[in-house]
Amino acid sequence: MSLDTVVEDIRDEAQARASEIQADADERAEKIIEEAEADAEDILEERKDEVEEQIEREREQALSSANLEAKQNRLEARRDVLDDVLNRVEDELASLSNAKREELTKPLVTAAITEFDDDETVKLYARADDADLLNSLLEEHEKAEYAGEYDCLGGVVAEGQQSRVRVNNTFDSILDAVWEETLGDVSEQLFDQ
């Protein structure tokens, strides 16, 4: 065997080995690329899922906030309507006719006075516009006297000199009590359909 043949055999063997190594490297590179592409696809799908979940969370949060704001607006509107109803009732009480005012005030005066002992002097306070009415109603009650003004829609506040008892029989206090008792019914009639 000649040297050229040996060199040729070594070269052929080296080329075959190089081709084998190259093919193996290409196969491994292709496998790595396929795995990387699969990983990239998985990562892309994960990111898409995360983005979709984030979008859904933000959408739910926005809907929840909008629903809460709408509910608050409805409640505020209802409160405004109820306040308007209460103000209209107060206006009607403040502008009662003299006959109606006397009809409503007389039992309040009597009820207030009966809360005190028979021998106790009772001082009654009323709104300034009702001073004459109160003085005429007190003509029937010897132990009671008009003592001055009280800021209210009508009715009386009575105080005993000895017992330090105070009875609030004003239209305001009665309206407050009735309003608290009937607020649910009023609200239901106005808003439930």
From Swiss-Prot:
Quaternary structure note: Has multiple subunits with at least A(3), B(3), C, D, E, F, H, I and proteolipid K(x).
Protein name: A-type ATP synthase subunit E
Organism encoding this protein: Haloquadratum walsbyi (strain DSM 16790 / HBSQ001)
One Gene Ontology MF term: proton-transporting ATP synthase activity, rotational mechanism
Localization terms from the record: Cell membrane
Domain of life according to the entry: Archaea
Role summary: Component of the A-type ATP synthase that produces ATP from ADP in the presence of a proton gradient across the membrane.
Family: Belongs to the V-ATPase E subunit family.
